[in-house]
Amino acid sequence: VRMWQKYLEKAGYKTAYINAWELDFATNPLVSILGEVGSLTGKGRKEFKKIIKALPKSVRLGAEGFISTYTGQEAIKNLFNRHKSFDEDITSYCDQKEALQQFRSELQNFIEVNCGGKPLVFFIDELDRCRPDYAVEFLERIKHFFCVDNIIFIISVDKRHLAESVKGHYGSADIDTDDYLRRFFDIEYDLPTPEI
């Protein structure tokens, strides 16, 4: 993976390498991803600051559902519901949707300024070795980047181990992990086992 990254860098591509296993202490994978984007700023420091400014609202996207779903604590969900009316929920949804669009727009602008017309390539390594909750959250976070032009994610994983993480995270051996993971991977390539 590192050789591929160096090859692309020599060809003029901006790349970022993320060893997810080393970073699974973080509570929010998006922070790790954007930290790597920040290291590529070059002449786009101003554009990067706009991305960060748009970030806080977009990070809240789905936070209430995440808390109640993944902690299993209905009381937390009820706490949110007691303090919101239906109109406030709709307004909040619209604000979050707008913030996510703004985040994507600022990220697109950053790529245009910094990447010379070429894609920004993220190499994600060791995701299959992470805690199941972090691995799934990482995938769920990067999906928000998929509709931004000129971003490519190359994810190096042992798919069998990642599938086990998905099963462990959702607490079900019956989940169709191939179907779930297909949402995140457009092209798959299996490396042959080396003959020693």
Protein language model regions, located:
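The catalytic "switch" region of P-loop NTPases
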Residues: 1-7, 104, 109-120, 131-196
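P-loop NTPase nucleotide-binding core
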Residues: 3-111
